Amino acid sequence: MSAHNPPRLVNLAAMSLLRDEALAIWSLEYLPMELYPPLFMAAFSLRRSETMMAMVQTWPFARLPLGGLMKKPHQETLEAVLDGLDVLLAQKVQPRKCKLRVLDLRNTGQDFWNMWSGDKYHVTSSSLMASVAKDMPRTKHPLAPLEMYVDLCLKENTWGKCITYLFTWVEQRKGSIHLCCKKMKIVSRSRETIKKVFRIVKLDCIQEVDLNFTQKLSSLAKFAPLLGKMRNVQKLLLSPIHGSSFTSQVEVTYHSGFPELITCFLSFSSRCLKIPLYNISITNCLLTELDLTHLSQSPKICQLKGLNLSGVTLTNFCPKLIQGLLEKVADTLEELNLNLCGITDPLLTALVPALSCCSQLRVFSICGNLISMAVLQSLLRHTDGLSALRLEFYPAPRESYSSLGILNQERLAQLKAELWQLLTDLGHPRKIWIKKTRILFLCLRCHLDQNLCET
């Protein structure tokens, strides 16, 4: 602590009080609520588990943002706080002083601790303070379930002792604790892992889901009803895990089962979700026209802002299906990613009218597709009226590749100059990115082989 930033008297008092932990615990009954945060921070810093356990039982605020103090999971601290909750849960009537209803383990609440530590320069919102430290009337009825908030990013074999301990603790007290997870990411090869997480977490609290999985993916269709119970989901990402250990045969088996999961989820989501979906990301998967029909007909996409279908092969889809989907979300869509979708000139030409109606579109990317210079120029002309468009990513035009699929840098530079001139002639400030990709070589070879067969 420097001379320019001396410790506050209240912080010094908290440190002094903790020299005698028994005295500190005894004094909690008489401690003003304003002194609780500084004392808890001191107890956390000095790892005074008994004091933290006792403070949880008399916490005078509605929320304890523990995650804002723990930069990394600390099992001893977590155990102390959960032991304090156990004492609370064992009581039939809420203690007079305790107002605690929410334990927040997310990386939030820094403003709360900054305010009570006197670090006013890092307090960003007084309204946030009110919501974190809001007082609540004491109930004389049996305690309602306590809520515990956590953002989960679970990778197989990397759960760690803290998350394992937390899950076991919550599962044993499921009737008294609601584990609420607004953001969830699971990377797993195991159905049992996913099943266990879904069994413990309160599903209707989830707002963002990022599910990465592999092996025998057709069996994941069994989880579609669980996904359907996530009634407040706003952002959904379903992605495969590609590893070097997989053969192409395994990947085909994986992809063949995936549409069943998508179809089931879209069907369930249409009936079960309480609020609209704001973001959908379905990548590197094989979808059917039935899946796309379910998606375009779902009433839950009426306010969709983000759509990512990168890696989903759209080559043989009926253009009207994709066109209908874009038309339905044209008034709200802000970000559209169609990278590596096997899009060629005929399909993109059919989609241009629908794309030009996406008035809120800010980000548009179709990299890794085989598009000619003429169609790319037509697309730029038709989207010139989209005033919100800020980021545009396009593939190098097909003409910049040789007959062997080798990129001709000189030809690419010439085509870029023509595109820049087109943008200048259109008269609106606009910046686009032209990207090269190796995947395009495979698309080009298929295109050349097809032309060769036709001739």
What are these regions (language model features)?
Residues 1-215, 221:
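N-terminal adaptor-interaction module of cullin-RING ubiquitin ligase components
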Residues 196-201, 221-230, 247-276, 292-301, ...:
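A structural signal for leucine-rich repeat
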Residues 2, 75, 84-87, 117-123, ...:
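C-terminal capping region of solenoid repeat domains
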Residues 7, 11, 33-41, 50, ...:
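Amphipathic alpha-helical interface elements that mediate macromolecular binding in regulatory proteins
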Residues 19-23, 33, 48, 110-113, ...:
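Short, solvent-exposed loop/turn at the beta-strand->alpha-helix junction
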Residues 19-56, 321-324, 334-342, 346-368:
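Extended amphipathic alpha-helical scaffold segments
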Residues 62-81, 230, 235-240, 245-248, ...:
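Long amphipathic alpha-helical scaffold regions
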Residues 64-67, 98, 103-106, 148, ...:
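Conserved hydrophobic beta-strand positions in leucine-rich repeat
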